[in-house]
Design a protein with these regions (language model features):
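Short amphipathic alpha-helix that is part of the acyltransferase structural core
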Residues: 1-37, 165-209
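Acyl-donor-binding surface of acyltransferase catalytic domains
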Residues: 1-2, 90-176, 317
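Active-site rim helix/loop that mediates acceptor-substrate recognition in acyltransferases
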Residues: 25-55, 198-234
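Conserved donor-binding loop and adjoining core beta-sheet/short helix segment
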Residues: 37-122, 235, 243-252, 260
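A structural microfeature
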Residues: 60, 149-150, 241, 312
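Conserved acetyl-CoA-binding loop-helix of GNAT-fold acetyltransferases
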Residues: 87-106, 259, 265-282, 297-305
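Conserved active-site tyrosine of GNAT-family acetyltransferases
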Residues: 136, 140, 303, 308
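Hydrophobic adenine-recognition pocket in adenosine-nucleotide-binding enzymes
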Residues: 257-259, 292
Length: 320
């Protein structure tokens, strides 16, 4: 049961309905503008949106998101604290909120969705930003989670200094079917620097199982045409890699890009990324978003060469 009110004690509860959205917005975050549409579209539910209150003052909030109406909560993407609170009150309030909400939403022993937060690109060196980020990470850690990865958020705009012009060594064609793409994804998973892929493999899943899950749970859900997806080949038809340009619920994105192990180290990533960027740019989109792990230096450099700007970062934390 949510904590019950008594005087000025802390009250922890879910929203009663969409009419309490203004209350939830009492604390700020960069995704606040998406909340109303997400609720209307079934990607959020009031019972997934929780607040910690003292009187009418919101001291902490948390919310989960689903990729499609009717789906289970997929990620904890809102977790905010009132940063005017002193420690340890600030952190303890956040911990109580998370523990209360997760006990209600996720039965004991069930998997808890990953926590993800968008953060400023300079948060390591900006004292104020660092305090905000670390306070939330500490609270999440106290509920049993750990940091999985920090990621770069990247953006290409039509005014970018680098135009998406493929180099000519590769030929591109549409993906024939699910089996062809998943087979290539399976090969790319081997030796991958991507933290999410590596943790899935470390859990005991095979590269094929990881790729099947990524296709079914992510790629198959995009609303954009599958004929945007491209296989990169050498003149003799040997596949080199692939790129998945797509639209998610909010932006045009480079959803997935990979080079097969035997072809890495030859600069093919630049041509493959240019092709994916070209396809999306041809849709007259205002921006193209992408992300990659901070530790995946080769991929980060490829995006930089292609004119993508690092406008932010993100942290992902997991419960195990």
């Amino acid at each position: 049961m949510p904590d019950q009110p008594h005087g000025h004690e802390l009250v922890i509860r879910p929203l009663t309905g969409p009419d309490e959205l203004a209350l939830f917005r009492s604390l700020p975050y960069v995704l606040d503008h998406e909340l109303a549409d997400d609720l209307a579209g079934g990607l959020r539910r009031p019972e997934w949106m929780w607040v910690a209150l003292r009187g009418d003052r919101v001291l902490a909030r948390a919310a989960w998101w689903a990729p499609a109406p009717g789906a289970a909560p997929y990620t904890l993407d809102f977790f905010d604290l009132d940063d005017s609170l002193p420690e340890p009150e600030r952190g303890e309030t956040g911990v109580r909120l998370l523990e209360t909400a997760m006990a209600r939403l996720f039965p004991a022993g069930s998997e808890r969705p990953e926590y993800g937060r968008f953060i400023p690109p300079d948060w390591h060196t900006d004292p104020v930003a660092r305090d905000v980020v670390e306070a939330r990470m500490r609270a999440v850690e106290r509920t049993g989670a750990r940091l999985l990865v920090e990621r770069l958020r990247l953006e290409w705009t039509p005014g970018a200094a680098v135009a998406p012009v493929p180099g000519g060594r590769l030929a591109f064609r549409a993906v024939r079917d699910r089996e062809e793409l998943v087979s290539l994804m399976t090969r790319v998973a081997e030796g991958s620097l991507d933290a999410h892929t590596r943790i899935s493999l470390a859990s005991g899943l095979s590269p094929r199982a990881v790729s099947d899950a990524q296709y079914d749970e992510e790629l198959a859900g995009y609303r954009s045409p599958g004929d945007w997806w491209r296989i990169a080949e050498l003149p003799d038809g040997d596949p080199v890699g692939f790129v998945i340009p797509a639209r998610n619920n909010y932006h045009a994105i480079i959803a997935y890009i990979g080079v097969l192990p035997g072809h890495r180290g030859h600069g093919y990533i630049d041509e493959i990324l240019a092709e994916g960027t070209r396809i999306l740019a041809g849709q007259d989109v205002p921006r193209i978003r992408a992300s990659t792990d901070v530790g995946n230096v080769p991929m980060a450099r490829a995006f930089e060469r292609a004119g993508y700007v690092n406008f932010g970062r993100a942290v992902n934390m997991v419960w195990e």
